[in-house]
Amino acid sequence: MAKRIVLFLLTNLAITFVLGIVLNIIFQVTGIQGGSTGGILVMSLVFGFAGSLISLFMSKSMALRSVGAEVIQQPRNHAEQWLFDTVQRQSQQANIPMPDIAIYHSADVNAFATGATKNNSLVAVSTGLLDNMTEDEAEAVVAHEIAHIANGDMVTMTLLQGVLNTFVIFLSRIISTAASSGKDENGNATQNTLVFWIVDIALQMIFGVIATMIAMWFSRYREYRADAGSAQLVGKEKMIAALQRLQHVHEPQEMQGSLAAFMINGARSKELFMSHPPLEKRIEALRNL
């Protein structure tokens, strides 16, 4: 299963890309082009933040569907009761409303937190995590997710993504307008619509990749903060033990999401595109607290 924090980003990019095309049509119909930089900026802000906000408010339901999880309404067994009690206790310690809780069936040792606000959040853990970790280790993982919620990481990621979206749309629009503009033999301003669309779409894709790299850097930074938050709630030794456990189990594929859903376990890939820092760096940071 490979679909968590970057699921938020992919959804956001898809929505922003579609909205960017809609924006192109609006500009063509209204005649707003490169001569109205202010108008382009305003429209870019509106459409840029629309993509990230839609992704944010869809994040909880998308996360549940993507892993086939159901919210625990009433604990039915020891594992559910333990998770319920742990989340309840830690959310009280962190001074946040108790999140919804879910367990999903997966061999991956993983957990994630998501939701639009602290009042509408979710903590979900895999059966693989519950089966392969001690209660102390699992407690630290849950605390890590609670820290994400307490830190407001989903909202913060949304604001960052909105700014990035705005620049992606704005810069693509400005450059594509300049590249497609010219003058006819009479000196009248002209624009090659085909060139405009090709350049604009290509630039949105290129700038979108750069924006994703920035978002991934920010996600890695927030992971360190969530680790520190877990250490405050349950002690750094438990969090270190949980990360060391992850080093000895099969790591799942890189999560392709804020949705931030912010999962505990990111896979190894080139660090620029990693949503999580390497485990050894996280352990070192905890030891230095």
UniProtKB/Swiss-Prot annotation:
Entry EC number(s): 3.4.24.-
Species for this entry: Actinobacillus pleuropneumoniae serotype 5b (strain L20)
Gene Ontology terms: biological process: proteolysis
Active site: E145
Keywords for the protein's UniProt record, in alphabetical order: Cell inner membrane, Cell membrane, Hydrolase, Membrane, Metal-binding, Metalloprotease, Protease, Transmembrane, Transmembrane helix, Zinc
Gene this chain is encoded by: htpX
GO MF annotation terms: metalloendopeptidase activity; zinc ion binding
CDD domains: M48B_HtpX_like
Annotated protein name in UniProt: Protease HtpX
Compartments it resides in: Cell inner membrane
Co-factor binding comment: Binds 1 zinc ion per subunit.
This protein's record includes keyword Transport: no
Highest taxon of the lineage: Bacteria
Record's GO cellular component terms: plasma membrane
Upper taxonomic lineage: Bacteria, Pseudomonadati, Pseudomonadota, Gammaproteobacteria, Pasteurellales
Topological relation to the membrane, as annotated: Multi-pass membrane protein
